[in-house]
Protein backbone atom coordinates (compact mmCIF):
# COMPACT_ATOMS: atom_id res chain seq x y z
CA UNK A 1 0.00 0.00 0.00
CA UNK A 2 1.52 3.32 -1.06
CA UNK A 3 1.18 6.12 1.46
CA UNK A 4 1.91 9.77 0.67
CA UNK A 5 1.35 11.25 4.12
CA UNK A 6 4.47 12.27 6.03
CA UNK A 7 2.66 11.10 9.19
CA UNK A 8 3.50 7.49 8.32
CA UNK A 9 6.09 6.08 10.71
CA UNK A 10 9.58 5.50 9.32
CA UNK A 11 9.89 1.90 10.48
CA UNK A 12 12.76 1.19 8.09
CA UNK A 13 14.88 3.69 10.03
CA UNK A 14 13.64 2.38 13.37
CA UNK A 15 14.69 -1.17 12.51
CA UNK A 16 18.42 -0.66 13.20
CA UNK A 17 17.60 0.59 16.70
CA UNK A 18 15.29 -2.34 17.40
CA UNK A 19 18.28 -4.62 16.77
CA UNK A 20 20.36 -3.02 19.53
CA UNK A 21 21.21 -5.08 22.63
CA UNK A 22 18.97 -4.13 25.56
CA UNK A 23 21.58 -5.40 28.08
CA UNK A 24 19.14 -7.65 29.89
CA UNK A 25 16.45 -5.01 30.32
CA UNK A 26 12.86 -5.68 29.27
CA UNK A 27 10.37 -3.15 27.93
CA UNK A 28 6.79 -3.62 29.11
CA UNK A 29 4.11 -1.63 27.30
CA UNK A 30 1.13 -1.19 29.65
CA UNK A 31 -2.23 -0.95 27.83
CA UNK A 32 -5.53 0.20 29.32
CA UNK A 33 -9.04 1.27 28.29
CA UNK A 34 -9.93 4.95 28.62
CA UNK A 35 -13.23 6.76 29.25
CA UNK A 36 -14.22 6.75 25.57
CA UNK A 37 -13.64 3.05 25.00
CA UNK A 38 -10.32 3.84 23.35
CA UNK A 39 -6.90 2.47 24.18
CA UNK A 40 -3.95 4.15 25.86
CA UNK A 41 -0.48 2.80 26.54
CA UNK A 42 2.90 3.70 27.95
CA UNK A 43 6.14 1.79 28.36
CA UNK A 44 8.46 1.08 31.27
CA UNK A 45 11.73 -0.75 31.80
CA UNK A 46 11.92 -3.95 33.86
CA UNK A 47 15.18 -5.57 34.94
CA UNK A 48 14.41 -9.18 34.07
CA UNK A 49 12.30 -11.42 31.85
CA UNK A 50 8.67 -11.72 32.94
CA UNK A 51 7.27 -15.23 33.41
CA UNK A 52 4.17 -14.53 35.50
CA UNK A 53 1.58 -11.76 35.56
CA UNK A 54 1.92 -11.75 39.36
CA UNK A 55 5.50 -10.55 39.04
CA UNK A 56 4.50 -7.43 37.11
CA UNK A 57 4.48 -4.20 39.12
CA UNK A 58 1.42 -2.01 39.43
CA UNK A 59 1.76 1.42 37.87
CA UNK A 60 -0.23 4.63 37.56
CA UNK A 61 -1.16 7.38 35.12
CA UNK A 62 -2.83 10.78 34.98
CA UNK A 63 -6.53 9.94 34.81
CA UNK A 64 -7.49 13.59 34.29
CA UNK A 65 -5.90 13.39 30.83
CA UNK A 66 -7.94 10.33 29.83
CA UNK A 67 -11.34 11.32 31.24
CA UNK A 68 -11.06 8.81 34.08
CA UNK A 69 -10.43 11.10 37.06
CA UNK A 70 -10.71 14.77 38.11
CA UNK A 71 -7.63 16.97 38.06
CA UNK A 72 -7.52 17.41 41.84
CA UNK A 73 -7.32 13.63 42.40
CA UNK A 74 -5.95 12.33 39.14
CA UNK A 75 -3.90 9.22 39.94
CA UNK A 76 -5.38 6.03 38.48
CA UNK A 77 -3.62 2.73 39.16
CA UNK A 78 -2.85 0.05 36.60
CA UNK A 79 -3.13 -3.55 37.80
CA UNK A 80 -1.75 -6.07 35.28
CA UNK A 81 -4.12 -8.91 34.36
CA UNK A 82 -2.43 -10.46 31.31
CA UNK A 83 0.69 -10.08 29.20
CA UNK A 84 1.69 -11.03 25.66
CA UNK A 85 4.91 -11.13 23.62
CA UNK A 86 5.41 -7.73 21.97
CA UNK A 87 5.23 -8.13 18.16
CA UNK A 88 6.70 -4.66 17.60
CA UNK A 89 9.75 -4.71 19.89
CA UNK A 90 10.00 -8.52 19.93
CA UNK A 91 12.64 -10.33 21.98
CA UNK A 92 11.57 -10.73 25.62
CA UNK A 93 9.62 -7.46 25.52
CA UNK A 94 5.95 -7.66 26.39
CA UNK A 95 2.59 -5.92 26.09
CA UNK A 96 0.68 -5.81 29.39
CA UNK A 97 -3.09 -5.53 29.65
CA UNK A 98 -4.08 -3.72 32.83
CA UNK A 99 -7.24 -2.90 34.77
CA UNK A 100 -7.80 0.66 36.02
CA UNK A 101 -8.35 1.21 39.76
CA UNK A 102 -9.03 4.29 41.86
CA UNK A 103 -6.78 5.25 44.76
CA UNK A 104 -9.46 4.20 47.28
CA UNK A 105 -9.16 0.58 46.15
CA UNK A 106 -12.31 0.51 43.99
CA UNK A 107 -12.39 -0.32 40.27
CA UNK A 108 -12.52 2.77 38.08
CA UNK A 109 -16.00 3.31 36.64
CA UNK A 110 -14.73 2.44 33.16
CA UNK A 111 -13.18 -0.83 34.41
CA UNK A 112 -15.87 -3.37 33.50
CA UNK A 113 -13.52 -6.34 33.57
CA UNK A 114 -13.66 -6.62 37.35
CA UNK A 115 -17.43 -7.19 37.40
CA UNK A 116 -17.45 -9.61 34.46
CA UNK A 117 -14.67 -11.68 36.04
CA UNK A 118 -16.85 -12.30 39.11
CA UNK A 119 -19.57 -13.81 36.93
CA UNK A 120 -17.17 -16.05 35.06
CA UNK A 121 -15.59 -17.26 38.28
CA UNK A 122 -19.02 -18.07 39.74
CA UNK A 123 -20.00 -20.02 36.61
CA UNK A 124 -16.63 -21.55 35.73
CA UNK A 125 -18.15 -25.06 35.70
CA UNK A 126 -20.30 -24.00 32.72
CA UNK A 127 -17.10 -23.68 30.64
CA UNK A 128 -18.50 -20.77 28.66
CA UNK A 129 -16.77 -20.24 25.32
CA UNK A 130 -16.97 -17.20 23.09
CA UNK A 131 -15.87 -16.29 19.60
CA UNK A 132 -16.01 -12.61 18.63
CA UNK A 133 -16.12 -11.33 15.05
CA UNK A 134 -14.63 -7.84 15.08
CA UNK A 135 -15.60 -5.73 12.07
CA UNK A 136 -13.92 -2.38 11.42
CA UNK A 137 -13.46 0.24 8.70
CA UNK A 138 -10.24 1.84 7.49
CA UNK A 139 -9.89 5.56 6.78
CA UNK A 140 -7.01 7.61 5.42
CA UNK A 141 -5.38 10.47 7.31
CA UNK A 142 -7.95 12.87 5.86
CA UNK A 143 -10.93 10.88 7.19
CA UNK A 144 -11.93 9.49 3.81
CA UNK A 145 -12.71 5.78 3.59
CA UNK A 146 -9.42 4.24 2.53
CA UNK A 147 -9.17 3.55 -1.20
CA UNK A 148 -12.44 5.23 -2.13
CA UNK A 149 -12.43 7.74 -5.03
CA UNK A 150 -11.74 11.27 -3.85
CA UNK A 151 -15.07 13.06 -3.59
CA UNK A 152 -16.97 10.02 -4.84
CA UNK A 153 -18.05 6.47 -4.15
CA UNK A 154 -16.96 3.02 -5.35
CA UNK A 155 -19.28 0.66 -7.20
CA UNK A 156 -22.19 -0.69 -5.11
CA UNK A 157 -21.69 -3.52 -2.64
CA UNK A 158 -21.37 -6.97 -4.11
CA UNK A 159 -17.80 -7.78 -5.20
CA UNK A 160 -16.04 -6.78 -1.99
CA UNK A 161 -17.01 -9.47 0.54
CA UNK A 162 -14.07 -11.91 0.66
CA UNK A 163 -12.95 -10.18 -2.53
CA UNK A 164 -9.73 -10.76 -4.42
CA UNK A 165 -8.00 -8.32 -6.73
CA UNK A 166 -7.33 -4.63 -7.21
CA UNK A 167 -10.45 -2.51 -6.92
CA UNK A 168 -12.15 -5.14 -4.76
CA UNK A 169 -9.95 -5.12 -1.67
CA UNK A 170 -8.01 -2.32 -0.01
CA UNK A 171 -5.16 -2.32 2.52
CA UNK A 172 -4.57 -6.06 2.60
CA UNK A 173 -1.03 -5.33 3.80
CA UNK A 174 -2.42 -3.79 6.99
CA UNK A 175 -4.64 -6.80 7.58
CA UNK A 176 -1.85 -9.33 6.97
CA UNK A 177 0.50 -7.45 9.30
CA UNK A 178 -2.13 -7.42 12.03
CA UNK A 179 -2.83 -11.13 11.54
CA UNK A 180 0.85 -12.00 12.00
CA UNK A 181 1.19 -9.69 15.01
CA UNK A 182 -1.68 -11.47 16.76
CA UNK A 183 -0.30 -14.92 15.99
CA UNK A 184 3.15 -13.92 17.24
CA UNK A 185 1.66 -12.64 20.50
CA UNK A 186 -0.38 -15.79 21.13
CA UNK A 187 -3.76 -14.19 20.52
CA UNK A 188 -6.22 -16.89 19.47
CA UNK A 189 -7.07 -15.14 16.20
CA UNK A 190 -8.98 -17.65 14.13
CA UNK A 191 -9.40 -15.85 10.81
CA UNK A 192 -9.79 -12.70 8.73
CA UNK A 193 -11.89 -11.63 5.75
CA UNK A 194 -12.80 -8.59 3.71
CA UNK A 195 -16.33 -7.45 4.50
CA UNK A 196 -19.33 -6.33 2.42
CA UNK A 197 -18.44 -2.63 2.31
CA UNK A 198 -15.13 -1.78 0.61
CA UNK A 199 -12.35 -1.04 3.14
CA UNK A 200 -14.34 -2.82 5.83
CA UNK A 201 -12.62 -5.88 7.28
CA UNK A 202 -13.20 -8.46 9.98
CA UNK A 203 -11.02 -10.58 12.21
CA UNK A 204 -12.24 -13.33 14.50
CA UNK A 205 -10.85 -14.18 17.93
CA UNK A 206 -11.78 -17.38 19.73
CA UNK A 207 -12.90 -19.71 20.95
CA UNK A 208 -11.75 -18.38 24.30
CA UNK A 209 -13.14 -19.27 27.70
CA UNK A 210 -14.57 -16.76 30.14
CA UNK A 211 -12.77 -13.49 30.81
CA UNK A 212 -9.93 -14.41 28.43
CA UNK A 213 -12.24 -13.67 25.50
CA UNK A 214 -12.52 -9.96 26.19
CA UNK A 215 -8.86 -9.75 27.23
CA UNK A 216 -7.77 -11.13 23.88
CA UNK A 217 -10.13 -8.95 21.83
CA UNK A 218 -8.87 -5.82 23.53
CA UNK A 219 -5.24 -6.72 22.92
CA UNK A 220 -6.03 -7.64 19.29
CA UNK A 221 -7.63 -4.20 18.89
CA UNK A 222 -4.49 -2.63 20.35
CA UNK A 223 -2.34 -4.48 17.82
CA UNK A 224 -4.65 -3.36 15.00
CA UNK A 225 -4.35 0.31 15.94
CA UNK A 226 -0.57 0.01 16.29
CA UNK A 227 -0.18 -1.69 12.92
CA UNK A 228 -2.46 0.84 11.23
CA UNK A 229 -0.46 3.64 12.87
CA UNK A 230 2.66 2.44 11.06
CA UNK A 231 0.84 2.43 7.71
CA UNK A 232 -0.69 5.88 8.25
CA UNK A 233 -4.24 4.48 8.30
CA UNK A 234 -7.02 5.14 10.82
CA UNK A 235 -9.22 2.39 12.26
CA UNK A 236 -12.89 3.11 12.96
CA UNK A 237 -15.06 0.89 15.14
CA UNK A 238 -18.17 3.00 14.51
CA UNK A 239 -21.14 0.68 13.80
CA UNK A 240 -22.35 2.82 10.88
CA UNK A 241 -19.37 4.82 9.65
CA UNK A 242 -21.08 5.81 6.41
CA UNK A 243 -24.74 6.61 5.93
CA UNK A 244 -26.60 5.21 2.95
CA UNK A 245 -26.77 1.82 1.30
CA UNK A 246 -23.65 0.46 2.96
CA UNK A 247 -23.34 -2.26 5.57
CA UNK A 248 -22.64 -1.29 9.14
CA UNK A 249 -20.02 -2.91 11.36
CA UNK A 250 -20.77 -5.35 14.16
CA UNK A 251 -19.10 -7.65 16.62
CA UNK A 252 -21.12 -10.84 16.27
CA UNK A 253 -20.80 -12.87 19.45
CA UNK A 254 -20.70 -16.67 19.26
CA UNK A 255 -21.59 -18.41 22.50
CA UNK A 256 -21.61 -21.93 23.92
CA UNK A 257 -21.44 -23.76 27.21
CA UNK A 258 -20.19 -27.26 27.95
CA UNK A 259 -23.79 -28.53 27.85
CA UNK A 260 -24.50 -26.85 24.51
CA UNK A 261 -21.43 -28.43 22.93
CA UNK A 262 -22.40 -31.96 23.99
CA UNK A 263 -24.81 -34.22 22.06
CA UNK A 264 -28.35 -33.08 22.81
CA UNK A 265 -27.10 -29.55 23.42
CA UNK A 266 -29.78 -27.95 21.25
CA UNK A 267 -32.10 -28.01 24.27
CA UNK A 268 -29.69 -25.77 26.17
CA UNK A 269 -29.23 -23.49 23.16
CA UNK A 270 -33.00 -23.04 22.93
CA UNK A 271 -33.18 -22.40 26.69
CA UNK A 272 -30.52 -19.70 26.35
CA UNK A 273 -32.35 -18.03 23.47
CA UNK A 274 -35.54 -17.96 25.52
CA UNK A 275 -33.67 -16.26 28.38
CA UNK A 276 -32.14 -13.75 25.97
CA UNK A 277 -35.55 -12.90 24.53
CA UNK A 278 -36.71 -11.76 27.98
CA UNK A 279 -33.75 -9.38 28.45
CA UNK A 280 -33.52 -7.94 24.93
CA UNK A 281 -33.65 -4.29 25.99
CA UNK A 282 -31.16 -4.79 28.81
CA UNK A 283 -28.69 -6.37 26.42
CA UNK A 284 -29.16 -3.70 23.76
CA UNK A 285 -28.09 -1.01 26.24
CA UNK A 286 -24.73 -2.74 26.60
CA UNK A 287 -24.28 -3.61 22.93
CA UNK A 288 -22.54 -0.44 21.77
CA UNK A 289 -23.15 3.27 21.17
CA UNK A 290 -24.94 4.37 17.97
CA UNK A 291 -26.09 0.80 17.38
CA UNK A 292 -29.54 2.09 16.38
CA UNK A 293 -27.93 3.36 13.17
CA UNK A 294 -26.93 -0.21 12.34
CA UNK A 295 -29.77 -2.39 13.70
CA UNK A 296 -32.41 -1.30 11.19
CA UNK A 297 -33.58 -4.63 9.81
CA UNK A 298 -31.54 -3.99 6.65
CA UNK A 299 -28.01 -4.90 5.61
CA UNK A 300 -28.02 -8.29 7.37
CA UNK A 301 -29.27 -6.98 10.71
CA UNK A 302 -32.34 -7.43 12.87
CA UNK A 303 -34.46 -4.52 14.04
CA UNK A 304 -33.32 -3.07 17.34
CA UNK A 305 -36.90 -2.85 18.59
CA UNK A 306 -37.75 -6.56 18.36
CA UNK A 307 -36.09 -9.83 19.33
CA UNK A 308 -35.95 -12.69 16.84
CA UNK A 309 -34.09 -15.93 16.25
CA UNK A 310 -33.76 -18.37 13.41
CA UNK A 311 -31.68 -21.04 11.70
CA UNK A 312 -29.13 -19.58 9.25
CA UNK A 313 -31.00 -16.25 9.37
CA UNK A 314 -28.61 -13.29 9.26
CA UNK A 315 -31.55 -10.95 9.68
CA UNK A 316 -32.33 -12.34 13.14
CA UNK A 317 -31.13 -11.20 16.55
CA UNK A 318 -29.87 -14.71 17.28
CA UNK A 319 -28.71 -17.06 14.52
CA UNK A 320 -28.39 -20.80 14.94
CA UNK A 321 -25.94 -22.07 12.30
CA UNK A 322 -27.47 -24.64 9.98
CA UNK A 323 -24.75 -27.16 10.85
CA UNK A 324 -25.60 -26.81 14.55
CA UNK A 325 -29.30 -27.28 13.86
CA UNK A 326 -28.51 -30.41 11.84
CA UNK A 327 -26.17 -31.97 14.42
CA UNK A 328 -28.29 -30.97 17.41
CA UNK A 329 -25.53 -29.31 19.44
CA UNK A 330 -22.89 -26.60 19.23
CA UNK A 331 -23.29 -22.83 19.66
CA UNK A 332 -25.39 -19.81 18.72
CA UNK A 333 -24.53 -16.38 17.36
CA UNK A 334 -25.80 -13.10 18.83
CA UNK A 335 -25.77 -10.68 15.89
CA UNK A 336 -26.84 -7.60 17.85
CA UNK A 337 -23.54 -6.32 19.33
CA UNK A 338 -21.97 -3.36 17.52
CA UNK A 339 -18.34 -3.14 16.46
CA UNK A 340 -17.54 -0.65 19.23
CA UNK A 341 -18.66 -2.81 22.18
CA UNK A 342 -16.77 -3.22 25.38
CA UNK A 343 -16.43 -7.02 25.24
CA UNK A 344 -16.33 -7.22 29.04
CA UNK A 345 -19.88 -5.84 29.16
CA UNK A 346 -21.15 -8.08 26.36
CA UNK A 347 -19.62 -11.36 27.52
CA UNK A 348 -20.44 -10.50 31.12
CA UNK A 349 -24.15 -9.91 30.55
CA UNK A 350 -24.27 -12.99 28.30
CA UNK A 351 -22.92 -15.09 31.19
CA UNK A 352 -25.35 -13.42 33.59
CA UNK A 353 -28.37 -14.12 31.37
CA UNK A 354 -27.49 -17.63 30.20
CA UNK A 355 -25.90 -19.01 33.38
CA UNK A 356 -27.68 -16.96 36.02
CA UNK A 357 -27.31 -13.79 38.07
CA UNK A 358 -25.13 -13.71 41.17
CA UNK A 359 -25.50 -11.57 44.26
CA UNK A 360 -22.36 -9.47 43.98
CA UNK A 361 -22.37 -8.66 40.24
CA UNK A 362 -24.84 -6.91 37.94
CA UNK A 363 -23.74 -5.96 34.43
CA UNK A 364 -26.54 -3.46 33.83
CA UNK A 365 -25.64 -1.54 36.99
CA UNK A 366 -21.98 -1.91 36.05
CA UNK A 367 -22.61 -0.16 32.72
CA UNK A 368 -24.62 2.57 34.44
CA UNK A 369 -21.61 3.35 36.69
CA UNK A 370 -20.07 5.18 33.71
CA UNK A 371 -22.59 8.02 34.02
CA UNK A 372 -22.33 8.43 37.80
Swiss-Prot record:
It comes from Kluyveromyces lactis (strain ATCC 8585 / CBS 2359 / DSM 70799 / NBRC 1267 / NRRL Y-1140 / WM37). Residues 112-372 form the GS catalytic domain. Residues 26-105 form the GS beta-grasp domain. GO terms for biological process: glutamine biosynthetic process. PROSITE patterns: GLNA_1, GLNA_ATP, GS_BETA_GRASP, GS_CATALYTIC. This is Glutamine synthetase. It is an enzyme of class 6 (ligase). Belongs to the glutamine synthetase family.
Amino acid sequence: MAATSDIVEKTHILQKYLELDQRGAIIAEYVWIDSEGGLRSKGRTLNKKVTSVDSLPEWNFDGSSTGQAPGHDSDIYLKPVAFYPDPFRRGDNIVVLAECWNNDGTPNKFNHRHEAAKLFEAHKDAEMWFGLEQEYTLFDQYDQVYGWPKGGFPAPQGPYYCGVGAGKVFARDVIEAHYRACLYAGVNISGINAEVMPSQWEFQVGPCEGIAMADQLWIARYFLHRVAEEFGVKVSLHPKPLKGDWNGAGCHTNVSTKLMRAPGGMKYIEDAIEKLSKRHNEHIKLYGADNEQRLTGRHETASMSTFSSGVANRGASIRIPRSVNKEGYGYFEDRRPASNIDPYLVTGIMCETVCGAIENANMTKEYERESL
